[in-house]
């Protein structure tokens, strides 16, 4: 209520009455402050009020009350009016007595609030004396207990450190009181000190109430923190120790675990405790080392058990290493080659004697001590110790870059040097031994007195902390004499335990901002030096604590980010690292504020005067010393040392003037700030100078002049110059003081005295600089010096005198060497494996280094022998079984050493004979090559040749490729197998499997070098005949992928050659002149040589890649449909090969084949390209290009010297054969010379009809010339290869086309038959020549060119036909035809897979034409042509392998047409109707479908018309005699009668015919002619109409004119279109009736036709004109011959054009080609055969197709004579 009333005064001014009432209430409640507030509010109303209230003057009574109130508050002096005040109070009490209950509640509330703000701290101690640690812990514990739980939980998640727990309390602590118990008897203290110490910790932990959450772990619960820290550390160590061997066994490739731990908090623990823990952990590690080695997982133990069972405990003897001894003897023989010339004694020791000493020799092992040490660690490899040491200098950790690793190396060296800088930081025992413990000053009585003073004058909690901090940190002046009169400071003059220091540090960090503000306020008022000293000493102590904390956090961060920590498996937590970094930033900000405070403070005083005071001098030196430490920790760039050096010099000058006692300031309680003395300052000066010098080296910027830095490090490390002279000659800058020279001498001495790690790190940095600056010569010199240093050190007393760390040191040295030698080899690789030849380097220095390298080679070869022994005997344990990482590292170092030895050996050998690198004789090449081969054989046998990322393989490849490839082709093949994993066999040699990893990928440089070796291997045998194996194909593919396609845009010459090539192919026509020039080698292409970097392509890379792709394409083509994209890629490769001006005949040859395959691909899959002439142009152009490429191949082969170039002889035969076949395909069907007519670039030609672009012109050569060229080419091919039946087969066909005599043709075909029989596979025989022989003999005999007896002789000589009745005389042609039928059946039976269709067709044709056996002919042809619904296609035939492309579609047309003839002859109307839908869908499987469709439709119509006795003018006569009106009326009446009465039986066949014709019309719509179909439909309907006209009495007789309504009106005539609606209505009406009829009578069509034919025969009306078959044939004869669409010329024109071209090119053809010796006689006319009798049988299919010219000749003859003439001049298209 009171609060509300007071708040209300804020919003609105109160009147005087209200204020007086409030005054009385507050006075009654004894709230003097509130009463004063109301009176002051009332008095100030006149000045502050904006209302009328301000105009009323203040009453004097109010002022009187205010005076009395001030007197009660002791603010003013009492006056005589005290009685008035007393009376006033009594009146108020009486007036407000009714508020007594409220007053009581109010007072209770005030008392409770006061109690909450007062804290009583119970000081608990049972020990002998009270100490500040327990006091501070009790205070912290109490404050922690008062914390608000919700705030604690919320802030615990934020993990905020150094937070004052007072900030989390619920109520302010305005008063602090201490409860101090009475101490117990001293005797009990002596017995229970240890017990109470532990109880104190336990009580501290257990007194925390339940549910209380600890917030500030570091500040509020230190004991618990220490326990957690120690437990975590022990747990981590245990896990590391237990898991190290297990992890190494489970995954040998993992990094070895190092037993290092990380700090869990940035607050350092007690140094004594930590040191004790380190000592204990080391002892535990030593004691547990043995069981740690045995610890492994079950899986590893099981594996070890298995290995122990497999490897017996065999005794290792010298006989186990016979190969090694032989190998070393071989190596010594190589060394002897220049030992004689150079008078040296380079030799290798028999290391087998070292590894297996002789038993009879009682002397100790003669090997050096480090060799025995090496053998010891090999057999007893300690992963934890040795692996870490082996990799301690590794600058290429996984996942890091070279620059990053170099930085790590620098950081590591700086850490070591920083340790060196701290070597003088330890306390001076003489000066520090008198420092007492804090308990000697702060006794129990002193602390109790201090606490009693606090109780007497209660203070705020923060004020209490400041009082305690001041007492412990600031200057103290004792009042008594028992401690002397000198002032002292507890933080510097006494030794604290770490727990007290940690508590004070926490309080300092928590309160430093409050202290700083307080000191600043006091500093403004401080005038005297004595008062200032108190604050100054306090400030300096605070500053020292902050600096010490800052350095500790900084060291922790550096430890977590250091290289050693990164190598452990416990990676730093990013969140933890971020939190610690944030703490570092916070402490840094605090330090900056305090530094500014000191600067402000020192500016306000006279420093020189103040320094005269000893106390001020001490505190000033302490400040400067801590300031220097802060700057050193913050300064990471040691080049900028000027400021620190100046501060050190200043401090040194100040302190050197004092006495020794005064000049020594102990600082015993700081971990990172050592004591102040002259020696410690000098040590810091020296350390800073050294770090500055090395910083110039470590952090020298690239691109700047770093000669001084490099020279410094060279002076320190390289021992080929005097150190003193080097220092004097060193061009030091002016800034470098005398300390630099002293520091340089000191660091050299320090490196000599310190462990070898320092020198190894220094070498690493020196080599890093050489590497980064690409100073190869210096790197080589440094490497040689480093090798000398390593051997010197390993043989020194320093190494031999090591105890406990000897083996680890050996591993470190060898690991450092391994790293340096690999960097050196990388530079050698860039320098083409050549050593630097500086003027100061002599042969003696090379020999010295080589001899030292041989020592290292012997050492590391012992590792290989040891691994071999581990495979033999279980007494030897492989390093790999312990640490795969170490095993791989040793392999790398071993291989690197071998590689360096090869390089130095090569250098020495050439120096011995004094030759240049470019003039190495073959003997030297052979020696070096043999050395490499021996090394590779030995290393490969040991399965280590691929180590060091294939370094040795790379070296060997680069050296051997530069030598004669023929000498080392097997070794190069082995190198390719090991390095690139491409196994290339050479003759009988196959590379051995060395079980290597793929260590390299081909690049352009390596591809060019290896192609010079690989491509000649491919050409050892003609690749066209002996295609390289698949292993070579993989390698060629890799080469091509690296080289890629030509870049025409960047090379003008290549672009020109490419354009020239394209123009040549696109614009060249095949003329007789072009044929002549190519056959005589006169054709030239003006290609220019491309740049010199195209050697690999000129060597045949593109050609070989195209050849291999072509070979695989041919294999896939047999099983699956080929892809044009593959051929396009092949064409591109071959074209690119020619564009590089190779003029390679084989490339032209393969190009011709590739284009030929494209032509075949266009022709064999669909007939689209053959049905439309325009579509054939593209295919013809491809065929033209194919022929041009073949001719260019012939042109190039003619240029070459065939007699000397043996591989070309076999190629010429294949070239001529394939060329002749392609040209034959171009000249014959289906292309029909089209390739000689087309041109890819259309020409603009003026014609009589107008100018136009023309793509097809007349043929450039005649067919006769083409056939002669083909014949001559086949003769050349046969001379080259006489066992290819296709050559003879095609030659016989060409000879027949050239009208050679039948005997010549059949003799050639006989040879083809014999070869084919010999080469046939029983499961897939060759039947083409055998069938061709039967077909030709049949044709020759029928046309009279060959006698029957001669034909029988040829049939008898065929091994497949083998006609046994050859002696039988033949008197009649029918007998001969029967023999032909038997021979064809024999050929058919010879076809096991039933793929060939031509013999069956020929057999069916002979049966039909010669014997009239329609049924048997149908049975034979039915295997090809099928009307069954199960067969989707009409004609089902396979394409035999040797069938020419495109002929397939001609055969399908031929067979389908013949089938139509058979069905028509058999008057099988059902078969013809069933053929309609299948034929309609056959557009893609045959040519001339429209013609065949027309034939089929006309055959069906004519059979139906003949059956219904419908002649040609039947419909016209009916329409002219019938009136339109009458017909339409009668037709409607007809439909109505049929609906009512049903379909009469006599008209059922008419409706079925009408249904069939209507369906045929639908299929024919838009496809073929419709006049005959429409006329037939109308005729059928007329027959139905006439039937009803006769049967119905209501209809008028036919022919009665329809009366017109008007004489002047013109009568409408009846047309065919008037019938179609009626027909449609009739079919719709009786659709179901028709379906039922066809279902019940499926043979109704053929039955009706048969009955009609019989009826005609009975009526005697059978005549020639009425014979259906003859009529169909005569109608077919009158039709035009089916012509190939693209050749719009008949046979007469074709022959005339050919003869014309033959006449024009007679002279050229005679000079190009020579006729064969077996030319046909001049008179090639057809001889009359007495056995040839004209046959009057039905026309054949071929006659209907190809005899238009003969039809014209016999147009005037009678039909019978015409038929006989056609049969006598028969030509069969199946001969193609």
Curated annotation (Swiss-Prot):
GO terms for molecular function: nucleosome binding. It comes from the Eukaryota. Its main location: nucleus. Residues 180-218, 241-260, 1709-1776 are annotated as: Disordered. It is found in: Nucleus. One of its GO terms (biological process) is chromatin organization. Has a role in a nucleosome assembly pathway that is required for the integrity of heterochromatin and proper chromosome segregation. This is Histone transcription regulator 3 homolog. The gene is HIR3.
